[in-house]
Curated annotation (Swiss-Prot):
Oxidoreductase as UniProt keyword: no
The protein's name in its UniProt record: Auxin-responsive protein IAA24
Domain of life, source organism: Eukaryota
Known function: Aux/IAA proteins are short-lived transcriptional factors that function as repressors of early auxin response genes at low auxin concentrations.
GO biological process terms, semicolon-separated: auxin-activated signaling pathway; regulation of DNA-templated transcription; response to auxin
Induction: By auxin.
GO cellular component, one term: nucleus
Keyword terms: Auxin signaling pathway, Nucleus, Repressor, Transcription, Transcription regulation
Amino acid sequence: MASSSSLRSTSCLASAAETDADNLCLRLGPPGSSITTTTTTGGADPAAKRSLGAKRSLESTDSMASGTGTSAAGDEHDDDTAAPAKAQVVGWPPVRAYRRNTFHQAAAAAAATKKGGDEKQKQQQQGGGLYVKVSMDGAPYLRKVDLKMCKGYRELREALDLLFTKCFSATASDGCSDGQFAIAYEDKDGDLMLVGDVPWEMFISSCKKLRIMKGSEAR
């Protein structure tokens, strides 16, 4: 019995010594923790703990890097979204809608008026009379004559003679055979030409204005 009691005491002392040794071992963890890692030798493996800590540090670093990349991508996206706002600043202040509409309406009205005037002139030339202004040197007024009512240069001369108090007849009766007055006209190009140089049809299509000038100026 005595030997059995001594064996139990020895076993308890050995167990207590082993427990004290385990408590005195250095571990990675907060104080008071009782985390034990068993290996094939039955003790704690500090190298494994260091490897575990390094792995956790690497994961933390990757996590932070990923967060930074996401933040940078978000900032870049925000910059791209804000870029059109800067482009809209160009051309400030903007033209208001009613001003644009007014401008377009005025332009359309001017185009319609011009088109209507051209059509009216074309219809007048085709179906109605072909009136041109007539001026005479020394006369304070202008007259108009319808070229379509004349069949040639002779009838045109007679019509002008009636408009300006028979100036051509008076000149002929005075014995001035060379003529005191001459008839000229202004063509499409604005050039002044003498009446009778071109065929009658060409004359009435290009005549814009008639002028009765002195014969001395026509020479």
